[in-house]
Amino acid sequence: MSGGRRKEEPPQPQLANGALKVSVWSKVLRSDAAWEDKDEFLDVIYWFRQIIAVVLGVIWGVLPLRGFLGIAGFCLINAGVLYLYFSNYLQIDEEEYGGTWELTKEGFMTSFALFMVCVADSFTTGHLDHLLHCHPL
């Protein structure tokens, strides 16, 4: 036995049905990616919606967009961006996933709740200096 270290082999790529398994992140960015696993695609839609909710929530809290127009704007942008993503960019058959409405509402309520928390949090943080100053009566 020699005193040298044993050389570790690099990990082999995972195989799925005899083909190389492609990572989810590379599929998200490629318009010609094939989505064999429906749950994997629905997970991507769900998390993409959550990212949109955080970004829009911070923007809405900083600007401050409030009321009906703020909520309606969030709903339209959130649904519109995802619809453009899966119908125009990926060009998937919506009927395989239960129709356009099923994909549009996938994870919507949790993203709406996250949006509301981010709006309140960023609005409060942006106006924290007013809350910290105590004015005598």
UniProtKB/Swiss-Prot annotation:
It is found in: Endoplasmic reticulum membrane; Mitochondrion inner membrane. Expressed in embryonic stem cells and differentiated neuronal cells. Keywords: Disease variant, Endoplasmic reticulum, Intellectual disability, Membrane, Mitochondrion, Mitochondrion inner membrane, Transmembrane, Transmembrane helix. Residues 1-44, 85-103 are cytoplasmic. Residues 66, 128-137 are lumenal. The chain crosses the membrane at residues 45-65, 67-84, 104-127. One of its GO terms (cellular component) is mitochondrion. It is linked to Craniofacial dysmorphism, skeletal anomalies and impaired intellectual development syndrome 2: An autosomal recessive disorder characterized by flat face, low-set ears, and cleft lip and palate, as well as costovertebral anomalies including bifid and fused ribs, vertebral segmentation defects, and scoliosis. Intellectual delay can be severe, with absent speech. Component of the GET- and EMC-like (GEL) complex, composed of RAB5IF/OPTI and TMCO1. The GEL complex is part of the multi-pass translocon (MPT) complex, composed of three subcomplexes, the GEL complex (composed of RAB5IF/OPTI and TMCO1), the BOS complex (composed of NCLN/Nicalin, NOMO and TMEM147) and the PAT complex (composed of WDR83OS/Asterix and CCDC47). The MPT complex associates with the SEC61 complex. Interacts with NDUFS3, NDUFA4, NDUFV1, NDUFA9 and NDUFS8 of the mitochondrial membrane respiratory chain NADH dehydrogenase (Complex I). Belongs to the EMC6 family. Component of the multi-pass translocon (MPT) complex that mediates insertion of multi-pass membrane proteins into the lipid bilayer of membranes. The MPT complex takes over after the SEC61 complex: following membrane insertion of the first few transmembrane segments of proteins by the SEC61 complex, the MPT complex occludes the lateral gate of the SEC61 complex to promote insertion of subsequent transmembrane regions. Within the MPT complex, the GEL subcomplex may mediate insertion of transmembrane regions into the membrane. This is GEL complex subunit OPTI.
